[in-house]
Amino acid sequence: MLLFIIFLFCNLLMVGVFFAVYGGKRPYAEGMLLGVHLPQEAADQAEVVALMDTFRRRTRRFYLVNLLLGVAVCLVAFWRFSPFLILWCLWLVEFVVGAQWLLLGTHRKLYDLKMARGWVVGEPATLAAADTRASAQRRGQGPGLVWHLLPCGLILTTLLLPGVRDFLLTQGSGWGLLGSGLAISLTLWALHAVLSRRGNKVYSQDTAVNQAVNRLERQVWGWTLLLSSLFNAAACWSAAWWMARAHWVGHTAYGIYLVLELLPAAILLTGMLGMARRRRQILAADPVPLVVDDDVYWRKGWYENPNDPRWLVQDRLVPYNYSMNMAKPGAWGGTIALLAGVGILLVGLCVLFLWADFGGSSVSITSERV
């Protein structure tokens, strides 16, 4: 029952997050529609409106079907875990690939339509625009990186509790909870470091607007990542409390741990959506926006510009995400290796639990011997 509840909650949350990020409304903003630069009059053309209506209709149907499938898959958990895990992995792959396919496919159709109709805004840029005054302004950028020592230190201090040390030495099952918690906080710390050191992006010919938007992005990223790390540390402390108090990590402990670990996801999502809304408000009031038609480098749905020295750039379709410059040496190799690693991990887990459910050792008892 607990397994059903945990995965049901995770599936519902995942579908909701994906819909908010990839399937939400796509209004005409910053001179773009679905990541494609278009004149306002072109965005109102009947064929463009029809394309976007089709995209919204298919998106709603796709997420509704996958919401129902995500609930149905969880019912298999009442039978055996290995068949459930296989079906869940298949559903997860279908859901992630389908969400990307819907978004990128429509983006490419809109780009092809733009080029066929000649709706080009200016000339494609080979290098990113720069605003030296905005780049020099670094104040008010959110919490410093040193603050991430706090959640990492809190997780490590759980090892000072005698009951926790005894549990880890005798049971060993708690190492996964505390180790994964520390890895999450270190990852959030590293992500904050990367984002805080990236160059300022130019949105406008007005330096004040550029400073406001870049300051907003760094503050939101900084605080959401730090708060997420603190809640992650709280999850580790909740598990450590059960280890020290009961010398056991049961269903209640895992449930509390899961809820506290899901709070960072809610914090990040809320922060990113709020940041995107506030950024649209700032740029909508900008009297001198900077429009650079670099759609040729985004025509496939990802960034591919050999003239740009950057490895990571702000994603065009999901502004609070980041895209790798696929024109860089090793970018494709690293992406394929990462996907292959995830695939091998999922297949390995499925095989392991299949063996545990159906191929493991058995014990038979008779009146004379075992």
PLM feature segments, named:
Residues A20-H37, V120-T132, G274-A327:
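Membrane-proximal soluble regions of multi-pass membrane proteins
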Residues W355-R369:
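Alpha-helical transmembrane signal-anchor/signal-peptide segments
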Residues W79-W101, G105-H107, A116-G142:
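Membrane-interface helix-loop-helix junctions at boundaries between adjacent transmembrane segments
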Residues A72-F81, L160-L168, S238-W248:
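Juxtamembrane "helix-exit" motif on the non-cytosolic side of transmembrane helices
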Residues G333-F353:
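Internal/C-terminal transmembrane anchor helices
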Residues A46-V65, A129-L154, Q211-W237, G301-A340:
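Loop-to-transmembrane boundary segments
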Residues L2-A20, P83-L103, L168-W189, A253-L268:
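Alpha-helical transmembrane segments
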